[in-house]
Amino acid sequence: MNRATISRWARLIARVLLGLALTSAGISHLGSARAEFQAQVPPWVPLDPDFVVLASGVVEIIFGLSLVFLWRRKMWVGLLVAAFFVAIFPGNISQFINGIDAFGLDTDEARGIRLLFQPLLVLWALWSTSAWSLIRTAWRSRSHPIR
């Protein structure tokens, strides 16, 4: 196997694993871990925490299944998933700042370490779907004053 083939397989496996993880997390939003997810909704969000948890769970299931099955649209799905991970990051920051215990994150150190993993999820979504190429193309096609 050459390098390109290995890279394609690695991306495929990473994309499917991320899709399965998102689907599983989304299902847990709707059931077993619902109360813990509600505790993570920042107090400044102007919506009912239960609605936020249910809606984000449905979105995670859709994104997870899309990562697995919509391979022809994988780059666009990857961009959306990365944007979703960025959008939920304030909830993780709120959990850290307010010292909210959930999912075994019961110390500031554990919550702080979790914050470091969120950018990795963004990178995972972009790399495994090859969405970087969309970003590069968009960046190159724009006229930049600093060129």
Label each PLM-derived region with a short phrase.
Residues 1-147:
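Membrane-interface extramembranous regions
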